[in-house]
Amino acid sequence: MAKNLKLNIKNAQIAEAINLSGLKSKLAKKKEEESTQKSSAAKSTSKTTKTEVEELPKEEAPRIRARSKSAFAEAPADQSSKEITEEIKTSQDEESISREAAKVIEEKSRMKTSAEIRQEIFGEELSQAPSKDSSQELEFAEKIKTNETKPTTFIEPTIASPAPAEPKSLVEDKTSITHVYQNQKRDIPIRESLPPQEKLGPTGKHMRDFIKPKPQPERVSRPLEANNSNQKEVSEANKEKLDKNKIKPKSKGFEEPKVLTADDDARKGLKSPKFKEFKDIKPARKPETRQFDARDRQGLRTSDEDQHWRKKKNKQRQNIQEDTTIRPTSLKVRLPISIKDLASEMKLKASQLVGKLFLQGIVVTLNDLLEDETTAQLLGQEFGCEITIDTAEEKRIQITDKSIREELQQSPTDQLQLRPPVVAFMGHVDHGKTSLIDAIRKSNRAAGEAGAITQHIGAFRCHTTVGDIAILDTPGHEAFSAMRARGADVTDIVVLVVAGDEGLRQQSIEAIQHARAANVIIVVAINKCDKPNFNPDNVYRQLAEQNLLPEPWGGQTITVNCSAVTGEGIPELLEMLALQAEVLELRANPSMRARGTVLESEMHKGLGSVATILVQNGTLKRGDALVFGLLWGRVKTMHDEYGKELQEAGPSTPVEITGLSGLPEAGQEFIVVKNEKEAREIANVRSEGARQNTFMLQQKKKVSMENMLQQASATGKKMLNIVLRADVQGSLEALKVALLKIESDKADLNIIFNGVGEVSESDVQLAAASKAIVLGFHTQIESHAEALVKQLGVQVRLHNIIYHAIDDIKVLMAGLLEKIAQETEKGKAIVKATFKSSQAGIIAGCQVIEGSIHRNNYVRLKRGQEVIWKGTISSLKRVKEDVREVQKGIECGILLNNFTDILEGDIIEAYDITYISQEL
């Protein structure tokens, strides 16, 4: 049905285009005048054509869709019909009626039906229209081939692309078909057939518009005259192609686009463009075949029905880039390592590692460090990576994992030599340790000490009758516990000095514990045997209580009665020390690299960092490179206890050295390395590791001055900030420990900075900014910092004795506490009457019933049991005289300060306020 409707529309368009209705009317008039010799074929043809034209509706043709196969979809029908009508009129004027009459008979035999004309012009297939038998169609086609003459020529234009052609190319070659009806001749121009309209896409263009043609060889432009001369040959060639197309049914499949040549450009009057080479980026699509569906079964689909609306739009596929990262299956890392660095090594995102650890209950951030070897390895297994810990750098910076004793055990016996014993004198304060050492050395060291107490660890090399002895003098004060522990660690023998008149005290017992912890032999020297109240049996009993059974009581602990003042018992003490050293067989290897311990360190004004060290094994030479924990150094100078310069120091020799990068902590071990460069590298790596550890601690517990002040204010405690300065590292450590032992529920101590050396400008500025007090121990203020102290008003406290410094700090902490107000009752008065005064207000007429009321007393007004008001007395009068005090039983007038709500019967109580200082 739809096919027939389209054919009817096309017939109407053809009839309107060639003005077929006017021609038919003229032909009908001519046919009536013709003779009876007309053939039946012509009559049937005219009747068929007439009936078909008459049956066509004369309505306006409906709008043709853009995708229709009609040739008139490309060009307006009105324009083409006007051109054809004008040509028909001109041809009618030029040709005469006589020429038509001569060829009437010839044209009668060649008359065709309108359907055949449409098939010739448009090449359409009339599958559904009524048609003749196939044999008749073949005979008619052969007849058309034989009867075609030169006046009728059809030229198929060469189309370069499926885009609409220009209007002037719609009719390229116009020929005249001569018809003679009743001695009348007329040339009817036949419109050139156009290819059927291709189906267009949603953009209004065919797919071939987007396909670039293949590059062709360079075109050769021909002159226009040559093209005109060859026009006949082209027409003949096109006619042969048209003949073939009449027989062969037109294929509806995909057609390759025709390449436009230079001849075609010349024929259209176009200039030949420059040749541009291009590539076919997007290949042509294959023709899509439609499946047989339900509409085909029901006969509802036509062959040319548009299927584009059924096609789903191909969504643009997102260019998903595949992850081509090659992740390692094994990895060697060095601990500690941050999460970010580990993720970079594993070629992963840091968030992946953080997520895995979070699932295991470990909350970390990108910059957190992993220190646990097991955690790092398990994390690697989660991502298929085997992680091993690189310990090569640790071993390098550790230098050696063997202790001094293990090195000596592995050394050849022929290289080992006897060394002097290292003896530490320990005991309670004021029991005579330093005096006993002076008696052995025949010196007067104790006289030069502040407060007659030792506050530094001293190291000496003594030459005695029994041989050389290295002596360490340790402080006996309770604050110097760490010093005593260090002395016990590096010594071979501990001499416990006990005053015979006092016995064992707290620090004496502590010294015994340090010696036992260090597994050191203890020799007890009972001092002060020259005093009348000397009682060695009491000391024996106390030693037995500490599991040190003395020899006089059948034990193994050696005891010697001696006196530092008279020198009694000192030779026996030296003999016992030599005997113990012989029993221990103390040996060392002088040919090895030097190793030892830092006993003390201080900041010298001219020499910089100075350290007192004890060489325990090997030989230290001037110029050697050392490593002290995080510091390094190169020995520039080396002196003994007398200030004598040395070139080398053997085992069991205490010396002072300079040339250090910083101030080493007391108790640190040192070791000699190959050169200064290696020492610097090792110290830098250690410092970096320590810095990372410090950063981790700060991340876990962020502490700042503001936070501490807020915490102190939240708990209601006062805070005393202190900047500490001491002459040596050991004294600084002892002072810091002693200060932190001060306990109080009302005030706290905060050491914001501590260092070795003199009080500097930076210390004063820091104290001023943090409202702190500068405490110096055995040190002074720098000359250029004194003016700054006065300018900023900073308190600087300098002390030489440690317990004086501690007592001073306690007083300062107590001064921070607010004083407690205490009220003392003075007297009472009862209000008998009230008087109004225009100037003063209400005056209370009172009688003192208890004590006395003074003019400067504080008063409170009570009404019943409730205190109504507290304040001061503005005026106190007796009759009309101002008085300072009113005694019991006397009437007076009292004017309260800024209070007038006084009633008869109120009681006025007088009291004084005293402020009492709090204790820690």
Swiss-Prot record:
Location of the tr-type G domain: 418-585
Region (G5): 563-565
Pfam family membership, one: GTP_EFTU
Alphabetical UniProt keywords: Cytoplasm, GTP-binding, Initiation factor, Nucleotide-binding, Protein biosynthesis
Region spans: G2: 452-456
One cellular-component annotation, GO: cytosol
Parts of the chain that traverse the membrane: none
Chief localization: cytoplasm
Keyword GTP-binding on entry: yes
Gene3D superfamilies attached to this UniProt entry: P-loop containing nucleotide triphosphate hydrolases, Translation factors, Translation initiation factor IF- 2, domain 3
Localization (cell): Cytoplasm
Biased composition (Low complexity): 37-48
GO molecular function: GTP binding; GTPase activity; translation initiation factor activity
UniProt name for this protein: Translation initiation factor IF-2
Organism: Protochlamydia amoebophila (strain UWE25)
